Regions:
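N-terminal leader/linker segments that precede catalytic domains of diphosphate-processing enzymes
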Residues: 1-78, 82-136
Length: 136
């Protein structure tokens, strides 16, 4: 447990010290993705996730694989995420999309911070949100 607390504290302190770069996103579609950090846990034991085989016992991020039948980015690996709804913050969007896409429901106090918003060629301004899923 101490190692989990130490990793969470380290990630949170680094994010708090990070000077965010906020590009001009006027007129762009706003979106958020979520980077879920799990410390030395098996995915099968993370709160809310079904049992899976072959998970690493090291710190990990959760990725999704887009359906092969989609018109855009079919079959690609992606971070959970999506468009920011009216009145939502990037953090709220990240937690909502995580629950919708992966079935993992985390709480606002699991949010550790943000990374720089980046602009895509397809007209999106995407804000990465880092959250803590804890240990197995």
């Amino acid at each position: 447990m101490q190692r989990d607390d130490a990793l969470r504290a380290l990630v949170a302190s680094r994010l708090a010290a990070w000077q965010l770069h906020a590009p001009d996103a006027a007129g762009l579609k706003q979106a958020a993705v979520v980077l879920v950090v799990a410390d030395e846990g098996r995915g099968a034991q993370l709160r809310g996730l079904r049992q899976a085989r072959g998970w690493s016992t090291q710190a990990a991020l959760i990725l999704t694989r887009r359906a092969k039948g989609l018109s855009g980015h079919a079959g690609q690996w992606a971070l959970p995420g999506g468009r920011i709804d009216a009145g939502e913050t990037p953090e709220q969007t990240a937690l909502r999309e995580l629950q919708e896409e992966v079935g993992l429901q985390l709480q606002p106090d699991d949010v550790l911070g943000r990374l720089d918003t980046f602009i895509t060629r397809s007209g999106y301004a995407i804000t990465p949100v880092v959250v803590w899923a804890g240990a197995a």
